A protein has these predicted regions:
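A cross-family phosphate/adenosyl-ligand binding-site feature
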Residues: 1-74, 78-149
Length: 149
């Protein structure tokens, strides 16, 4: 499935259904090869180069006036700065930040350590916990924050 295919599917779902919250956890792919080959690339060449083109940014292009848009930012440095830039550039209501280089968090782990930011300035840290408990805490926090507006 390509990023364009995914974008079309999401747009169709948003036309047919109303969602309170839209969580977009990760990009399908940020880049795709410029040229595709249906043939096997032979291994006789020691090195090859691929030219990559940026794919459609699905999250940035979702337009839903009735749904909260919530994105994720996986960073290795300058996390808060980069997450807040993404919050603004993609017109999100909330962004959830985690670090790829943090031990016992993120990929290959059942636990995570997160930060939640809102477009209104909310900043909340969620200490290391199971991903299941964190997901419940995130939803509760977002609902509470929305009710307090």
């Amino acid at each position: 499935i390509s990023a364009n295919d995914m974008k079309k599917m999401i747009q169709e779902l948003l036309k047919k259904h109303k969602y309170d919250m839209i969580f977009m956890a990760a990009a399908v792919a940020d880049y795709k090869p410029e040229n595709f080959s249906i043939e096997k690339i032979k291994s006789h060449k020691k090195n090859i180069s691929l030219k990559l083109n940026q794919t459609t940014d699905i999250l940035k292009n979702i337009i839903s006036l009735e749904s909260l848009k919530i994105g994720f930012a996986l960073e290795t440095s300058d996390g808060e700065i980069n997450a807040k830039k993404k919050l603004d550039s993609k017109s999100l209501d909330y962004i959830i930040l985690n670090y790829a280089n943090e031990e016992n968090a993120g990929f290959d782990s059942n636990t995570n350590h997160l930060f939640l930011y809102s477009k209104e300035g909310l900043k909340k840290e969620f200490i290391l916990d199971t991903k299941y408990r964190l997901s419940l805490d995130l939803i509760k926090t977002i609902i509470k924050n929305e009710k307090n507006k």
